[in-house]
Amino acid sequence: MALENKLGITNSAELAREEERISKRKAVELFESGALDKLAPGRFTSLQAIHKALFEDIYDFTGELRTVNLAKGNFRFAPLMYLEAALGNIDKMPQSTFDEIIEKYVEMNIAHPFREGNGRSTRLWLDQMLKAGIGQVVDWSRVDKEDYLLAMERSPIKDVEIKVLLKAALTDDVNSREVFMKGIDHSYYYEGYTTFKTEEL
C-alpha cells in the first residue's frame, strides 16, 4: 500500500517512480535558482524548507514533524516525545569544522524528523553546511552505497567511519552543476530510486 499522497496513487512502485521524477526536478530548481544558498546553514528551519521544496507536490506533510515513531531494521530513530527537544539541541551544535558538521549531520539522521524523505533532504542540508563552513561539498558519486549505509548505521555509536568516508569524497567544486546532478542521482540511489537521471529531467 502506498503512502497517502496528493497524486492519488495507490501503487507503491508507481508512487516511488513519480516521487523520484518530481522531487529530482525540484532539487535541480533548488540548485539553479540559488535558493539553497539563501538558507541559514545547519538550521532545522532550512532542512524543513529543503524537504518542503522537494516533496510538496507529492505529500501533504512536507516540512512537518512526523507524528509516528520510526525504525529502520533494529534501529529506532528519536522517539516522538523527544523529537522537538532533539531538534532544538541540534540547532545549537557547532558547525565550524568538518568533524563538527558531520557530528551535526549524524544527530539529524538520528532525529529523522519527517515521515518520508529524510535521507535525501538531509544530504542536501549537509552539503549546504559544508559549503558555508569549509568551502567544500561531498562528491556523492565517489561514496559507495554499501559503505555509506553501513557507516550511517554505525554512526550513532561510532562516527569515525562516516567521517573518513565523506572526508575522502570532499571536493572544492561547490558550484559545479555536474557534481550536484551526480550527487542527487547517488543520493537517490542509496534509497533505491534509480529510474530517472537528474540531468535528463
PLM regions and their residue ranges:
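FIC/Doc superfamily catalytic core
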Residues: 1-201
